[in-house]
Design a protein with these regions (language model features):
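Structured, hydrophobic secondary-structure cores that serve as assembly/anchoring elements
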Residues: 1-146
Length: 146
């Protein structure tokens, strides 16, 4: 991940106030060492100055997680606006319990079921009025080729 990678992701991202970076925790040290180009000594990453507030990269909040691919893989960092994500609740949360199977051990089994799915409401990037620039509310960094 380089400064150029991040600025190109911003270039192709549908700019909104709700955009956040979601990055692999294995990348956490990389932006901390990056600075703006041309001798500007300020880091592109800023730690939160307040408890409960996220760190930022290039002014956008960043969430560090192990739920995305490891550093060097496609999707290890992405810029997302989750307001462009639909959630489909297929079944309300249901609870059930039984002691039939483990009755002799004086135990009860519990089951909770919630059927839910989600997906972006835009399947492809869209072209801006200039006829060439494409943007999307979901932009990921591709895999490294080195």
């Amino acid at each position: 991940m380089t400064y150029t990678d991040l600025t190109e992701m911003l270039e192709h991202h549908l700019e909104t106030q709700n955009s956040i970076w979601v990055a692999s925790i294995s990348l956490k040290g990389v932006p901390m060492r990056m600075v703006y180009p041309t001798g500007n000594p300020f880091p592109i990453w800023q730690p939160s100055a307040r408890d409960g507030m996220p760190d930022t990269i290039l002014g956008r909040p960043v969430v560090w997680t192990e739920k995305v691919p490891l550093a060097g893989s496609a999707g290890d960092i992405g810029l997302y606006d989750f307001n462009h994500y639909w959630i489909g609740d297929r079944q309300a949360l249901t609870f059930a319990s039984t002691n039939a199977e483990y009755f002799k051990y004086d135990q009860t089994s519990y089951r909770m079921v919630h059927r839910v799915d989600g997906r972006p409401w835009m399947n492809t990037p869209f072209t801006l009025q200039d006829g060439t620039s494409t943007v999307s509310p979901f932009v990921i960094l591709g895999a490294k080729t080195t």
